[in-house]
Amino acid sequence: MPTEYFERRERALLGDRFDALYAAPQETAARGVTVSALRAAPEQFAAQADFPVEPSPFCKAGFVVQDPAFKPGRHPYHHAGVFYSQEPSASSAAPLLGVRPGMRVLDTCAAPGGKSSQLAAALGGQGLLVSNEFVAARAEVLRSNLERMGVPNAVVLNEDTGRIAAALPEFFDRVLVDAPCSGEGMFRKEAVAVTQHCEALVKQCAALGAQILDNAAACLAPGGEMIYSTCTFAPEEDEGQVAAFLQRHPEFTLADVFGNVDYSFGSPGEANRTGGLPLDVNKVRRIWPCQGGEGHFIARLVKAGTPRALPAPGTYTAEEELWLAAAAEQSKKQKGSKGGKPAKAPDARSARRESSRTLREAVQGRSARSRDAGAGEATPAQSLAAWQEFARQYFPALADRPAVVHGGSVLLPVPFPQTGLHVLRAGVFVGSVQKGRFVPEHHLFTAFGALCTNREALTLADPRVTEYLSGREIAADTAADGWCCVTVDGCPMGGGKVSGGRVKNHYPKALRLL
């Protein structure tokens, strides 16, 4: 056992069941991948994958990676957003939320993005996903991962959940709280989880989790549902946390954790872990190491009231139309820009945003110098006209979608109110005018590559896949001259520009295989 405190506590709670429950079936931490429905069906992935996997018991789209030496992050399907590399039991929580297209969904503690990518897949490109992360550097990783997964309808926030609750009360149909925890389910995966573990950390995490839960409850609309999950075994953070929350919030009821799905896994909660408070432990779920995952706890909570009626597929509510109109009006007020955001008086908050923007561009492989040289002096009207001309040629299905100019780049926005929250991304930046020409962004291809009329279609076995992901030019076979989307087995990896039978590589430098 990693720490004396952990073993003493768990032996006292479990008695003679201790050794059996903590006996993992494998020597190293379990590894898995979760397939995104935005890219492929699980059955299609299983048939086409060139590495050994077996279905995960925790999620219909999840698979256990059987080869301990396999590196998912270097696989072309990872780059194409087909799967997210995720510890198997970590994929269990998001599907239990019962997300449907058209809903407004909040992931309160979203980095690095595995559960958000599952929520995005359930939305199917319709509705709104707000993915929040409090730590700035982790929020940038979250943004990058959602772009890689091709999520078109996400707002990425770098905020405190209390500010979100104040700005967006009773706004969301579904909320996921995968709370920061003491990480006892990460002991085998991350050495730091062992070195940092102590009783004081458990108490600190329990207090933070309670605060986040209270804020999340304020964000949830009447009739909405919330999933609370952790990757720890500590009673104060699991059964005890949920029991205490229900005492503070009589407007919530504990629901069967499997009420939205047709499968089950794991074991019921433990009655001696509630801190003496009432809780139907049969409605919550634990995943023990002996069950094939590193460890997880999940509870499903429902808020009293009548759920919001969802808009018809492909439509917006009147309120959402107003938000889009407000974004367009704000765009018109911007002056011609050389890139970046409109200038304003420097203060602590703007400095924080500038620092965040610099890091974001580093992840995208764009420097401040190239940004300033790239966008030129195009006015918002000129930028929009250039985008519409580009879209009519390569993405005709997007040509009539609402578009705005933000910081010199053209954005396909998502309907989201102007709240003053720290937004890293709200929709899809599709490109900007550089030296008089429209140059597309990487996110345009990952989010909408299936709509591109000019594609260089590769198969997984094609050596050009590795060449493209390494940043090299490749021979053009199926794509005509001009901009194209480069795909692997029909899934977009990124963009390129064809000339003379060659595809000039536009895959971001920071993402390339080394």
Regions found by a protein language model. Give the residues of each.
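S-adenosyl-L-methionine
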Residues: 132-170, 177
